[in-house]
Swiss-Prot record:
SUPFAM superfamilies: P-loop containing nucleoside triphosphate hydrolases. It comes from the Bacteria. This is Uncharacterized protein in trpE 3'region. Signal peptide: none annotated. One of its GO terms (cellular component) is cytoplasm. Gene3D superfamilies: P-loop containing nucleotide triphosphate hydrolases.
C-alpha cells in the first residue's frame, strides 16, 4: 500500500467532568460554520447526556 502525502489535522480534546469540553465543541461549531468536523464521543453510563448536548449539524 502506497503512503499518502495528504495529512489531516487532528485535535484531541480531553478534560475532567464539568471542565467545559462540550461548551467548547458547541462554540467551535457555531463560530466556524464552513468547517467540517468529525466528533467521536466516548460516553460511560446509562444516559448519553453529552451526545444530546452537542448540537446536531449536518454537512452540506
Amino acid at each position: 500500500m502506497k503512503a499518502s502525502s495528504h495529512s489531516t489535522p487532528v485535535t484531541v480534546l480531553t478534560g475532567f467532568l464539568g471542565s467545559g469540553k462540550t461548551t467548547l465543541v458547541n462554540r467551535l461549531l457555531k463560530e466556524r460554520p464552513g468547517t467540517r468536523f468529525g466528533l467521536v464521543v466516548n460516553e460511560f453510563g446509562e444516559a448519553a447526556l453529552e451526545s444530546q448536548l452537542v448540537e446536531s449539524r449536518r454537512a452540506p
